[in-house]
């Protein structure tokens, strides 16, 4: 009986530490989950499908931007928050490009994945094409705003005059 009493006292003295530990862990975990999965809306005018995007691109002479993504892709969500939602990017993309998102999990996009050598469904991939759909520039993986603007500049220098 005497042995259990000191153990109980030790447990009671350290109990509040464990409560705070789990509270802090919960707050940090929820914050990280919100950061990874929160994606603000953006004002980019996305094309409905590849055929219509290529048709618009051919008629306007503007290059296409293909963004290969998936609902489960955390780096894609970070790009959507940090790159696609940016006002400068929105202005440039809407005025000088035809943007199209391609969900790698959609079976209807299998031909597009094959055409751009993404049969494995790697995400995120950003490809800039000419009006005929030929790849001009591409980046694999999540990229920041400055690298994205350099990608656009390399493929269509006239689109980014004020950088």
Feature map (PLM): residue ranges:
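Thioredoxin-like thiol-disulfide oxidoreductase module
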Residues: 54, 87-156
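Disulfide-bonded cysteines in secreted/extracellular proteins and peptides
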Residues: 18, 73-76
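N-terminal targeting signals for export/organelle localization
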Residues: 1-44
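Detector for the c-type heme attachment site
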Residues: 77-81
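Short, solvent-exposed mixed-charge patches
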Residues: 157-163
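Short active-site neighborhood of thiol/selenol oxidoreductases, capturing the structured segment around
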Residues: 60-73
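A short beta-strand-turn-helix
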Residues: 46-63
């Amino acid at each position: 009986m005497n042995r259990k009493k000191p153990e109980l006292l030790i447990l009671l003295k350290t109990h509040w530490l464990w409560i705070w530990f789990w509270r802090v862990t919960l707050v940090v975990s929820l914050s990280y989950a919100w950061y990874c999965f929160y994606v603000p809306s953006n004002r980019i005018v996305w094309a409905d499908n590849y055929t219509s995007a290529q048709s618009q691109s051919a008629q306007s002479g503007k290059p296409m931007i293909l963004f290969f993504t998936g609902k489960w892709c955390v780096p894609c969500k970070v790009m959507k928050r940090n790159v696609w939602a940016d006002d400068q990017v929105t202005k440039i993309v809407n005025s000088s490009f035809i943007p199209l998102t391609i969900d790698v999990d959609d079976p209807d996009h299998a031909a597009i994945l094959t055409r751009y050598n993404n049969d494995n469904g790697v995400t995120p991939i950003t490809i800039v094409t000419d009006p005929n759909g030929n790849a001009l520039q591409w980046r694999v993986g999540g990229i920041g705003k400055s690298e994205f603007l350099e990608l656009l500049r390399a493929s269509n220098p006239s689109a980014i005059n004020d950088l």
